[in-house]
């Protein structure tokens, strides 16, 4: 039996670059990540996913996809109109219709993404001094580029300014 080669095919395939996380051009390590493990849908000031209509959910996931293209640090310098896209508040706000969930680590820094108009995505990040630190039990590293989503805030009730 003869072994046939398709040299045109092999030549063409060799021109297609191979993606790799080891390439200098790869930006996987700087793209922010979203985590829903602390999501709280039990407070009346916030909403659950089922409370948002299809268009609102589509907008939310389009924003998450867009925000995933950069680091959290990059988003602190971006604006949507006159509002920063991403803000870290450090502490839970004094004036809020939300209550501080009891299951969150006390070290967290509260933050939010501005989605549109009054709509905010509220959560937290870990402090810079925990970044790359190894957790004593899991042996995994903390990552300051992860946004932990806690609340959906459709009416800007997390950080009351008026």
Model-derived regions, located:
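Catalytic nucleophile-His microenvironment captured as a short glycine-rich beta-strand/loop
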Residues: 118-127
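Basic, Lys/Arg-enriched alpha-helical interface segments
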Residues: 1-115, 128-162
């Amino acid at each position: 039996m003869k072994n046939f080669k398709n040299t045109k095919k092999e030549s063409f395939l060799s021109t297609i670059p191979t993606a790799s996380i080891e390439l200098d051009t790869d930006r996987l390590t700087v793209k922010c990540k979203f985590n829903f493990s602390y999501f709280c849908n039990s407070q009346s000031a916030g909403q659950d996913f089922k409370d948002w209509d299809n268009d609102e959910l589509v907008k939310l996931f389009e924003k998450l996809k867009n925000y995933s293209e950069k680091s959290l640090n990059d988003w602190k310098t971006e604006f949507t109109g006159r509002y920063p896209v991403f803000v870290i508040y450090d502490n839970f706000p004094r004036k809020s219709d939300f209550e501080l969930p009891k299951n969150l680590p006390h070290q967290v820094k509260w933050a939010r993404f501005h989605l549109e108009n009054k709509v905010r995505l509220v959560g937290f990040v870990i402090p810079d001094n925990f970044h790359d630190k190894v957790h004593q039990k899991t042996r995994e590293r903390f990552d300051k580029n992860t946004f932990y989503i806690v609340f959906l805030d459709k009416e800007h009730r997390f950080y009351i300014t008026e």
